[in-house]
């Protein structure tokens, strides 16, 4: 009796279950609508996992299809049973024995066990050798090794001789166990087992039960026999049955197509032609020598293919294929050299043409004639017509299409990749008439045998679609698997073919095509969607082929149709029966033989009465879970738990039968679900109900603990039940475009004015404060930089100086440097006297002088500014001071002010006339300290010059330097018509008064502290020494300005001093505010305390020979300073430091010397040895033991030695000259001379030197360097004269706070970047720890969602804005003429409004306002300081610029004045219009004599020149800057765009992200200054909770008064500080106190025998503890750190995900902190690169493998097992650490392989999770974690610091910024992602990987390899 499925169906009886006719309605069958979530059975687990379960449970024979799965099962089983084999052989431990058939398999197994476990493995493969061993020798082996891998012969020998008894074996593994059926040692070994009472567990492995055709009876017998011999149950892997045995089985149909009737006779005729030709060729006896090609081969192949097409598809197709083959043949004929071969090819060609001609007689090839196709084809078309969609479906299914889910893919490997970015290409023309790709309800595959059949059948179906509207919906394509095989090398042409195939697959996956015609290649291994129609056009010939093609029909309603010719049908039915029988046998062997399909037949019955549903809000029909839907809910919930691409978490259900015949089920959820206990259901009548009921109970529990939401769906990470964590803030309403928190969004803020300077203009008869601005030259300009050989003018040489008069006191701020032409000048602001009053007249005089300084000396007044001292927000007076009558007391210099008022030269040019009668008389003393004005030119803005030198040897009659004039007198007569009255007067060499008013940074260094190139130093020297380049003036023609040069030089510093003062006061104010908000530091500083000086932290390095400057003793005596002293460095010292690294920067020690107090003995001896040795490429001083040393060196580092700006210095001898902090005036508090020695740890333990005069060494700052560890201890113990103040107790140095407020765009000597990075990693750490401890039940997905919300730029920006940071930030370069508002001035609204929109002075500030030039990289806002061409001197040395550039800038500088700038926020750059620089109409400059006038040009606008070349400025579309001009109406930016217009003097425009950066930098600043607890409190005060709040009772408040000392809480974030040790004080309003974080209480679950299980699971881990040198107090942490989510045998702890979340942040912080504290002081860029090079998965995974983490890893995931296996092998071969730049590919010969070796993320994860585990286990001690991890990471940190690696993608983009373009992702045939990078002109490079990111870096790495290989040929531009 035939089974109904096999009835041959006639045409009429073909009943297909198509989606359209399905009872569930037309859409149910959309293949992509169905999620891969099973609703009526639990999601099946991977078959290998179930086989492992079986093997753990009982003796098992594993029948697998492939070899790879065998190893996995064997190794994991060994590991699971490993606790039985650790330790000495009997009595306690046993041994595991692996038996293999041949010697060469031994090594393979050995490496597998060694790779994945730490067990000791012995290998025995040589019978001769092993047979001769004695019993003793064997027992040694057994003692040493726990796993024995031997060939069966050796094993038999060992067992027979009793060297090892079977009872000592815990597990016996037989590889290739099917051999036991034959007469084989395996059989004898099993015989021995029979006699043994305690037989070991047996595992048999076989892959060859099924080979080719075999008879079901035989098969069954074979299996039974094997089971009997091995005393085991055979279990097959599902891959032999049907790939997913729970998928509903497809409906199988065999169709009898009926005979082919050849009415026209064409078929017969063609067949005859072909057969004759084939016979003819076969008969030609062409002698074939073995070496030659067979001449007939190609012809035979072509003809037989053609014949096959004719037979299978009919004449129409044969015609098509003949046409294709003719084209193909032409190529062969053209290239064929040999005559004979050629003849055969031509013969074939002729025949094919003949066939085509015959066909043309019968039908027109253009259209399809169904008379000429076989019945099989007709049948196929008929089946396809049934799948035609209904009309209405065409609309509704669009929705499904859009919601389709990636779960529809068979392969899981794509679960993490997005392919949204793939462009959908234009379809080929024939498809255009299809309604749309959405209507494809069909998703089908037709399997054919031959390639040509596939190609032609596809053509035929396309033709049929054109003619038959019923078939028009089909969009088909074919895939032949040509060259798709994985490993063979591929030619270019094959490569193209391969690409085409992948495109076909991509379209099929995307449902753009709905029918695929394929050869058997698609049967296995290719990732394609679930199909609802599979047609076997050619019948399957063996079981495997049958099962695998059937396995493709996996949609819920699917048909598997086999088309058979009438003559074949009988024999096929026999085959089919066999296949079915085999399938059945194998099914029974399936480890879970519940047959999904049959069990569900009665699913439709309403079971609600059996067990009531779980309903929410029953009254209003709320959501419910019924007994029928519960399993689906549980599956869906498990699928949403966090996991990696390798693991798909599924529930595990065990059903047991009770004695009374009822069943109960126990349900276990994956181990990372918060519901950890197993759930036991009530007993039910049948298995199915038992399983369902337990699921229903589970849903109820999940809902109760908040894991299912109110719709009973899994709670996503977004709908966090921890609402309070995401303080949901209302997003501010702004009209500003851009995403909040991003760089694209900029807003304007007013610039902050410090409270103490706000409206503090002195009033008559009210008490005032007078401050002195002390100026001391601490580092004179070295000769190398003094190109003009100018004399240096130390400001302290003259007594007259400036002071500040104010109505409010100014807090103490650190001294700070300004850089004048003479060198570095240290500025101090000291209180001179207070409480005095001034009269109205005095104040008026002072006010007039104040205005005179800013308007006339500094020329800062412009139309837009108005002097209104009473109305100005920031108002105080600047006035001259001098010593009073020979005493040394300074006071206000009223006489001087009055003299100035009277002077004629005060404003204009005095009109003195000399004549022959009253000739000019030269008085030398008048000119010694004078500023002079030429009286004959530039009357509106006369030039002012310092007299540099009086040339007594020159007179007006001396020779004029240029040939046009004879003498100076003649020049003036000719050019200006001036006659001189005194021809004997000397001439004056003059210098311009400085126009550079930004003196914040030295001009020979850029803002990174790096010397600007001095290439032209020699040229310059020559230039300045020749007279031609000097300005020579005649005294008679000049007027003397009433302000002496010495005071003028000080006045030039005023803008910089006041600006810096202003910024530091803002920072000090912020420090005080934080002290009251967060309780960190004190509100007001003690009167006797001053912070160490502001320091840029770089040594001023210059590229030149070492120079020696001597101590100028006369100065030293007068002024109490020894002025310039440096270490004298021998010329060759630099070369001795042989191992110099480019990063090295502090190669010589700097020494400061300060005059000792009077009681100490006279002169200070400086004896510093010059013997510098190089240690690690850094030179240090060997013998610094002299007592004077400490004093000498201590002032140099200034506490926050945060040397931010180290840059790579060219490797040339470099010298440092000292920074000296010299204090002025006796009445100031004694400064603390503290210093953190950079090189502390190298100073031979000599750190504790004391100062020579016995004054105790004072230290006020913690050592920030790691090198300063020793110092740190000393600091804690010492008592300093300033009562032990330190920034730990007082708060950070305002200088450091200022640094945290300064963006890199400000081009200052420091910026926030380094601090920001430190703050960033600490913030991540603090929040992570807080979340980890506060939410012990939240899984990693939720924790990381909460973290990302908290640390997002958007959130930080909000908090920073709330705290008022934007106003305090320093965002643009200080340029006094453009954006500085002098004290007492206001922006004149009337004048500036008129000009708000059109300004011609939009110089650089527009570009520098903040953010990058045009192009915002996401990482950092960096702006390279592009100085003009000769960078070294942009101040006032004549630079060679084009005439028109100079005119342009001059005209800009003479422009209208108010600097308002406009930024267009349009996304498009209007580059053409934005850069028309318009000249003002009054271009009165004409052509000017180069030698003089050009010198006057104001280089303070040097930056305008940087932007002369528009191409450099705005590259992309961030914002466009318009340069506006009053005289031109509509130039510049299109007025349509939205723009921000703001006033540069009082407002600043800042990107949101910069504010977020600033918050992080401030955090870094508090962290380095006040420690970790303080940083946490600072975060809490911002509103970021990182500590638990505790409420204190009033009694406690009394116990812990507000101002408690802070140091008690300095324990690193440890949970050990008592919860009551709360913050010292919070702001009065909020009574919040913060406690300390508590370690989450339990890490083990309540479990009856938890301890036992724990010891069981971590057996062997003691070896690992030894390896990392840390012993766990609580071993559960250790187990948790190694438990992967797939490892369900661990029922007592969670998996590692939470610890990984914690460890990731801890390692990031520790590594960042270490890099930050590196004595090499890496620059921000290097720091970022190093951090990303060290904190990444590749490095962590490599280290994990190096330290054997993988051997202890606990996971049950076959794919992961293989990836780890590959990676470990790869690491062993490479045997070196992998950096980002490392070659992650297998070896040289894999050049063709596009894929990098895959780095298993799980390895990096356990590296992190172990850090988290140690942190928790050690009571939250970061130190302990670092002690364990630093030794592992140290070699890498050293290696990378010396040579910073960059990610390949970045390196490529830096190398080829214009030409490298990455393609979007393409999906490869096996589900991976491919990315192509094209480097224009140099080739295309491809990379493949599991995700877009991995593929992208693989591609970049390939491109780099190729570019580097070809570099020599590329000329270096």
Swiss-Prot record:
Signal peptide: none annotated. Mg(2+) 2 binds at residues 1700, 1805, 1808. The keyword RNA-binding applies. One of its GO terms (cellular component) is RISC complex. Binds 2 magnesium or manganese ions per subunit. SMART domains: DEXDc, DSRM, HELICc, PAZ, RIBOc. GO terms for biological process: apoptotic DNA fragmentation; global gene silencing by mRNA cleavage; negative regulation of tumor necrosis factor production; negative regulation of tumor necrosis factor-mediated signaling pathway; pre-miRNA processing; RISC complex assembly; siRNA processing. Mg(2+) 1 binds at residues 1316, 1395, 1398. ATP binds at residues 64-71. Coiled coil: none annotated. Its main location: cytoplasm. It comes from the Eukaryota. Residues 414-425 have a biased composition (Acidic residues). A motif (DECH box) lies at residues 175-178. Residues 433-602 form the Helicase C-terminal domain. One of its GO terms (molecular function) is deoxyribonuclease I activity. InterPro entries: Dicer_dimer_sf, Dicer_dimerisation_dom, DICER_DSRM, Dicer_PBD, Dicer_platform, dsRBD_dom, Helicase/UvrB_N, Helicase_ATP-bd. The record marks 1801 as: Important for activity. Component of the RISC loading complex (RLC), or micro-RNA (miRNA) loading complex (miRLC), which is composed of DICER1, AGO2 and TARBP2; DICER1 and TARBP2 are required to process precursor miRNAs (pre-miRNAs) to mature miRNAs and then load them onto AGO2. Note that the trimeric RLC/miRLC is also referred to as RISC. Interacts with DHX9, AGO1, PIWIL1 and PRKRA. Interacts with AGO2, TARBP2, EIF6, MOV10 and RPL7A (60S ribosome subunit); they form a large RNA-induced silencing complex (RISC). Interacts with BCDIN3D. Double-stranded RNA (dsRNA) endoribonuclease playing a central role in short dsRNA-mediated post-transcriptional gene silencing. Cleaves naturally occurring long dsRNAs and short hairpin pre-microRNAs (miRNA) into fragments of twenty-one to twenty-three nucleotides with 3' overhang of two nucleotides, producing respectively short interfering RNAs (siRNA) and mature microRNAs. SiRNAs and miRNAs serve as guide to direct the RNA-induced silencing complex (RISC) to complementary RNAs to degrade them or prevent their translation. This is Endoribonuclease Dicer. It comes from Cricetulus griseus.
């Amino acid at each position: 009796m035939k089974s109904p499925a096999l009835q041959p169906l006639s045409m009429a009886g073909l009943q297909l279950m198509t989606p359209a006719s399905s009872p569930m309605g037309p859409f149910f069958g959309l293949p992509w609508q169905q999620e891969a979530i099973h609703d009526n059975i639990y999601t099946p687990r991977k078959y290998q996992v179930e086989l492992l379960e079986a093997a753990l449970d009982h003796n098992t024979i594993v029948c697998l299809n492939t070899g790879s799965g065998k190893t996995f099962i064997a190794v994991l089983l060994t590991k699971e049973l490993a606790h039985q084999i650790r330790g000495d052989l009997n009595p306690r431990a046993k041994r595991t024995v692996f038996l293999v058939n041949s010697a060469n398999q031994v090594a393979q197994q050995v490496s597998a066990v060694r790779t994945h476990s730490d067990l000791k493995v012995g290998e025995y493969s040589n019978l001769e050798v092993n047979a001769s061993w004695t019993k003793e020798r064997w027992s040694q082996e057994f003692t040493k090794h726990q796993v024995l891998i031997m060939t069966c012969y050796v094993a038999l020998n060992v067992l027979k001789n009793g060297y090892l008894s079977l009872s000592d074996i815990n597990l016996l593994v037989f590889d290739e166990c099917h051999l036991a059926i034959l007469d084989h040692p395996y059989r004898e070994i099993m015989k021995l087992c029979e006699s043994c009472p305690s037989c070991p567990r047996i595992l048999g492995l076989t892959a060859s039960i099924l080979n080719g055709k075999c008879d079901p009876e035989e098969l069954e017998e074979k299996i039974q026999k094997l089971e009997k011999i091995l005393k085991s149950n055979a279990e097959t892997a599902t891959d032999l049955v049907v790939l997913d045995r729970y998928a509903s089985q497809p409906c199988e149909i065999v169709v009898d197509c009926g005979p082919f009737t050849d009415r026209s006779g064409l078929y017969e005729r063609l067949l005859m032609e072909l057969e004759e030709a084939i016979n003819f060729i076969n008969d030609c006896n062409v002698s074939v020598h073995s070496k030659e090609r067979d001449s007939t081969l190609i012809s035979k192949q072509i003809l037989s293919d053609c014949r096959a097409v004719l037979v299978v598809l009919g004449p129409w197709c044969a015609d098509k294929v003949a046409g294709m083959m003719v084209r193909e043949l032409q190529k062969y004929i053209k290239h064929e050299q040999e005559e004979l071969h050629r003849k055969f090819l031509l013969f074939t060609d002729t025949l094919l043409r003949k066939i085509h001609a015959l066909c043309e007689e019968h039908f027109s090839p253009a259209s399809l004639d169904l008379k000429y196709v076989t019945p099989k084809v007709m049948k196929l078309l008929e089946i396809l017509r049934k799948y035609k969609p209904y009309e209405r479906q065409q609309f509704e299914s669009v929705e499904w299409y859009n919601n389709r889910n990636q779960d529809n893919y068979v392969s899981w490997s794509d679960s993490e990749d997005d392919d949204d970015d793939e462009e959908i290409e234009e379809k080929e023309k024939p498809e255009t008439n299809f309604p749309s790709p959405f209507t494809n309800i069909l998703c089908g595959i037709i399997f054919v045998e031959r390639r040509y059949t596939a190609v032609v059948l596809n053509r035929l179906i396309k033709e049929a679609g054109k003619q038959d509207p019923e078939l028009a919906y089909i969009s088909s394509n074919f895939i032949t698997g040509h060259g798709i095989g994985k490993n063979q090398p591929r030619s270019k042409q094959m490569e193209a073919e391969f690409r085409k195939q992948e495109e076909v697959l991509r379209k099929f996956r995307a449902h753009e095509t709905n029918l695929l015609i394929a050869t058997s290649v698609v049967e296995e291994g290719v990732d394609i969607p679930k199909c609802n129609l599979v047609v076997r056009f050619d019948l399957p010939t063996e079981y495997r082929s049958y099962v695998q093609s059937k396995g493709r029909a996996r949609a819920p309603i699917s048909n598997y149709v086999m088309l058979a010719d009438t003559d074949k049908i009988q024999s096929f039915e026999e085959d089919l029966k066999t296949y079915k029988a085999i399938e059945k046998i194998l099914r029974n062997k399936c480890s879970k033989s519940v047959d999904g399909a049959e069990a569900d037949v009665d699913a439709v019955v309403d079971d609600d009465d059996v067990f009531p549903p779980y309903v929410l809000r029953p009254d209003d029909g709320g959501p419910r879970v019924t007994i029928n839907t519960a399993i689906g809910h549980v599956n869906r919930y498990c699928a949403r738990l966090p996991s990696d691409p390798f693991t798909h978490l599924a529930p595990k259900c065990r059903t047991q039968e009770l004695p009374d015949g009822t069943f109960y089920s126990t349900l276990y959820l994956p181990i990372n679900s918060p519901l950890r206990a197993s759930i036991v259901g009530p007993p039910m009548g049948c298995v199915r109900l038992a399983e369902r009921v337990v699921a229903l109970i589970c849903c109820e529990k999940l809902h109760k603990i908040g894991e299912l939401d109110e719709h009973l769906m899994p709670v996503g990470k977004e709908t966090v039940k921890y609402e309070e964590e995401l303080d949901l803030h209302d997003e501010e309403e702004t009209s500003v475009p851009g995403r909040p928190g991003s760089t694209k969004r900029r807003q304007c803020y007013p610039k902050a004015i410090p409270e103490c300077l706000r409206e503090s203009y002195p009033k008559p008869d009210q008490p005032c404060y007078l401050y002195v601005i002390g100026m001391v030259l601490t580092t004179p300009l070295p000769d190398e930089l003094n190109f003009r050989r100018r004399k240096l003018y130390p400001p302290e040489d003259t007594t007259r100086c400036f002071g500040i008069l104010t109505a409010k006191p100014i807090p103490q701020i650190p001294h700070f440097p300004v850089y004048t032409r003479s060198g570095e000048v240290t500025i101090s602001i000291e209180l001179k006297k207070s409480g005095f009053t001034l009269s109205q007249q005095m104040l008026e005089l002072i006010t007039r002088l104040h205005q005179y300084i800013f308007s006339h000396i500094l020329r800062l007044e412009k139309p837009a500014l108005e002097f209104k001292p009473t109305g100005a927000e920031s108002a105080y007076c600047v006035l001259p001071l001098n010593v009073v009558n020979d005493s040394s007391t300074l006071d206000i210099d009223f006489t001087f002010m009055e003299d100035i008022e009277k002077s004629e030269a005060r404003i204009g040019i005095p009109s003195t006339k000399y004549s022959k009668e009253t000739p000019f008389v030269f008085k030398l003393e008048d000119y010694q300290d004078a500023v002079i004005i030429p009286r004959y030119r530039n009357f509106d803005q006369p030039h002012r010059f310092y007299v540099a030198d009086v040339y007594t040897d020159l007179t007006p009659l001396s020779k004029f330097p240029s040939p046009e004039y004879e003498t100076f007198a003649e020049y003036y007569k000719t050019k200006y018509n001036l006659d001189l009255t005194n021809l004997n007067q000397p001439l004056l060499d003059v210098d311009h008064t400085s126009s550079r008013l930004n003196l914040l940074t030295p001009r020979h260094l850029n803002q990174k502290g790096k010397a600007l190139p001095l290439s032209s130093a020699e040229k310059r020297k020559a230039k300045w020494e020749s007279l031609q380049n000097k300005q020579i003036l005649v005294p008679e023609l000049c007027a003397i300005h009433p302000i002496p040069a010495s005071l003028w030089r000080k006045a030039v510093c005023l803008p910089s001093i006041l600006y810096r003062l202003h910024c530091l006061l803002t920072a000090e104010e912020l420090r005080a505010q934080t002290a009251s908000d967060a309780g960190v530091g004190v509100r007001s500083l003690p009167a006797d305390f001053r912070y160490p000086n502001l320091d840029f932290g770089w040594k001023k390095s210059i590229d030149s020979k070492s120079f020696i400057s001597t101590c100028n003793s006369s100065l030293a005596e007068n002024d109490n300073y020894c002025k310039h002293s440096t270490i004298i460095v021998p010329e060759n010292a630099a070369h001795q430091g042989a191992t110099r690294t480019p990063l090295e920067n502090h190669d010589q020690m700097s020494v400061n010397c300060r005059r000792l107090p009077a009681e100490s003995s006279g002169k200070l001896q400086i004896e510093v040895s010059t013997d510098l040795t190089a240690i690690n490429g850094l030179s240090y001083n060997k013998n610094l033991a002299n007592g004077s040393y400490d004093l000498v060196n201590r002032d140099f580092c200034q506490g926050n030695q945060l040397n931010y700006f180290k840059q790579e210095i060219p490797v040339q001898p470099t010298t440092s000259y000292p920074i000296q902090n010299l204090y002025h005036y006796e009445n100031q508090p004694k400064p603390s001379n503290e210093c953190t020695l950079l090189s502390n740890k190298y100073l031979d333990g000599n750190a504790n030197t004391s100062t020579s005069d016995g004054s105790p060494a004072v230290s006020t700052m913690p050592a920030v360097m790691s090198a300063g560890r020793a110092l740190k201890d000393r600091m804690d113990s010492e008592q300093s004269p300033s009562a032990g103040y330190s920034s730990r107790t007082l708060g950070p140095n305002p200088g450091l706070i200022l640094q945290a407020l300064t963006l890199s765009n400000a081009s200052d000597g420091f910026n926030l970047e380094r601090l920001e990075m430190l703050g960033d990693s600490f913030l991540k750490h603090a929040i992570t720890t807080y979340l980890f401890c506060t939410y012990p039940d939240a899984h990693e997905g939720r924790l990381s969602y909460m973290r990302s919300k908290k640390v997002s730029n958007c959130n930080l920006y909000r908090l920073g804005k709330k705290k008022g940071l934007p106003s305090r930030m320093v965002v643009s370069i200080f340029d006094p003429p453009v954006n500085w508002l002098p004290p007492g001035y206001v922006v004149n609204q009337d004048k500036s409004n008129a000009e708000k929109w059109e300004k011609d002075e939009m110089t650089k500030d527009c570009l520098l306002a903040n953010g990058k030039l045009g192009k915002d990289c996401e990482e950092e806002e960096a702006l390279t300081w592009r100085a003009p061409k000769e960078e070294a001197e942009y101040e006032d040395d004549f630079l060679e610029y084009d005439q028109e550039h100079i005119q342009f800038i001059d005209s800009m500088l003479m422009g209208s004045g108010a600097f308002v700038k406009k930024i267009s926020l349009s996304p498009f750059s209007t580059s053409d219009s934005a850069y028309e620089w318009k000249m003002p109409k009054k271009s009165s400059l004409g052509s000017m004599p180069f030698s003089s006038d050009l010198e006057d040009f104001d280089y303070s606008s040097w930056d305008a020149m940087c932007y002369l070349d528009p191409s450099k400025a705005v590259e992309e579309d961030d914002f466009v800057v318009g340069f506006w001009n009053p005289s031109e109406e509509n130039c510049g930016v299109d007025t349509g765009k939205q723009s921000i217009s703001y006033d540069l003097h009082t407002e600043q425009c800042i990107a949101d992200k910069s504010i977020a950066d600033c918050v992080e930098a401030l955090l870094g600043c508090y962290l380095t200054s006040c420690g970790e607890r303080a940083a946490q409190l600072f975060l809490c005060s911002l509103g970021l909770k990182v500590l638990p709040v505790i409420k204190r009772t009033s009694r406690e408040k009394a116990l812990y008064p507000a101002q408690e000392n802070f140091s008690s809480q300095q324990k690193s974030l440890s949970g050990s500080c008592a919860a009551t040790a709360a913050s010292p004080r919070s702001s009065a309003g909020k009574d919040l106190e913060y406690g300390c974080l508590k370690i989450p209480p339990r890490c083990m679950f309540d479990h009856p025998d938890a301890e036992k299980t724990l010891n069981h699971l971590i057996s062997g881990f003691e070896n690992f503890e030894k390896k990392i040198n840390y012993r766990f107090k609580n071993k559960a942490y250790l187990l948790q750190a190694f438990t992967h989510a797939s490892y369900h045998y661990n029922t007592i702890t969670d998996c590692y995900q939470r610890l990984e979340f914690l460890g990731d942040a801890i390692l990031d912080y520790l590594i960042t902190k270490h890099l930050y504290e590196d004595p090499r002081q890496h620059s921000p860029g290097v720091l970022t690169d190093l951090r990303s090079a060290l904190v990444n998965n590749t490095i962590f995974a490599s280290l994990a493998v190096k330290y054997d983490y993988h051997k202890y890893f606990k996971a049950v995931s076959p794919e992961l097992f293989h990836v780890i296996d590959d990676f470990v092998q790869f690491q062993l071969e490479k045997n070196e650490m992998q950096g980002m730049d490392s070659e992650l590919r297998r070896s040289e010969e894999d050049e063709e392989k596009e894929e990098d070796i895959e780095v298993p993320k799980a390895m990096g994860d356990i590296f992190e999770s172990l850090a988290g585990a140690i942190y928790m286990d050690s009571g939250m001690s970061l130190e302990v974690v670092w002690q364990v991890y630093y030794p592992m990471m140290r070699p890498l940190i050293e290696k990378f610091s010396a040579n910073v690696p960059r990610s390949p993608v970045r390196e490529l983009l830096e190398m080829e910024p214009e030409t490298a373009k990455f393609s979007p992702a393409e999906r490869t045939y096996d589900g991976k992602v491919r990315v192509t990078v094209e480097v224009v002109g140099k080739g295309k490079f491809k990379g493949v990987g599991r995700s877009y990111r991995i593929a992208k870096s693989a591609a970049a790495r390939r491109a780099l390899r190729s570019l580097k290989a070809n570099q020599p040929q590329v000329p270096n531009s």
